[in-house]
């Protein structure tokens, strides 16, 4: 409701709706923190809405208990997770299903009321949120507020989800027979093959919770979003991807990588926790001589593939730092850990401060699952990659790294010891790898320019703040 003549507008109250699974909420919180800092002069306040378990993890990760570590104009607001109280142990896919069912059944409207109550009755003036939580669109409309979704993955994957219906109509039930066919008839996707599409677009279980979620999201975004934040920077996406998205979503605002939004002295990476001594170990290694290996917190190769990877790292004769969940260590070849520790040629840890590791001058190659956050962290650090994708958008990301941007390689299927050794050797020292290393540095320079004074991502983030706060 507009203020009466002579009355000043109340300060903005932005509800930030998280998808409380995997790393989604943490990524959105980094944006909310940056938004809160940028919007403070306008008197804006932000309510960050997520489930109890999600908020507990965020508090632990950022040492934000009792509000410490959060800007004064950003508050956490707990919302129900949709799970029956009697169910103590619920598998994650079922948790997602219950959460989305609750959101669609009017839950987001109730969450916005909770945000209003937490803000002392201040009306929600804009709803920013993870694009996965598409029911926020209707809730925002009911509250008379614009919906500004945040997309955390790659632009090409977003385009594939928006075009799911036309892709299914084209490919039909022939996905298995057309795996290597380029998607030339779909604007923006000509660089990708049928096999690269995310699970649930033209193959896999269309009724799986994530497949249903992103399909509905892809249908909702073009008709309901006031603007869409993109986790990319000008010059990264191919022109056809950028043009196709601009035609479908006229108000795209690219200001990624999102982890670079916070000022250096405020970011978690300014003084990284390093309980396993990764950075000290890297300090004893040759410049650009180390292969860093990590497949994130969800993806994990099969036991036989883990052993092949370990054998390949040893065969490469390159020093390596491997972040691997401790429950997988018993699957490694006999004596592997002892040999690595005894010679000092390798370090296997249950967790590593990835951003700081990739920025370290000793790291020259990144063996990764090609999750989008990892890809962007590698890009912003200038490190070439060897990608072993597993699911979701990872295949599109790996294709982008190897064939669109040309700063790495991609395994087609499972890793072999010979393939790993060859990839690591090429990225670190190979003749063909020289072009990949140079291209990685070019992309790193583009990121630095985009986030420097007057850079395009800084300008775009300012525009995002204006869109969110002018409502």
Swiss-Prot record:
The organism's taxonomic lineage, starting at the top: Eukaryota, Viridiplantae, Streptophyta, Embryophyta, Tracheophyta
Pathway: Pigment biosynthesis; anthocyanin biosynthesis
Matches recorded under PROSITE patterns: UDPGT
A single GO BP: anthocyanin-containing compound biosynthetic process
SUPFAM superfamilies xref list: UDP-Glycosyltransferase/glycogen phosphorylase
Protein name: Anthocyanidin 3-O-glucosyltransferase
Enzyme Commission number(s): 2.4.1.115
Domain of life: Eukaryota
Gene: BZ1
Catalytic activity: an anthocyanidin + UDP-alpha-D-glucose + H(+) = an anthocyanidin 3-O-beta-D-glucoside + UDP
Family, per entry: Belongs to the UDP-glycosyltransferase family.
Pfam family of the protein (one): UDPGT
Function: In the presence of other necessary color factors, this glycosylation reaction allows the accumulation of anthocyanin pigments.
Coiled-coil boundaries: none
Transmembrane domains' residue ranges: none
Biological source species: Zea mays (Maize)
Group of enzyme by EC: transferase
Gene Ontology terms for molecular function: anthocyanidin 3-O-glucosyltransferase activity; UDP-glucosyltransferase activity
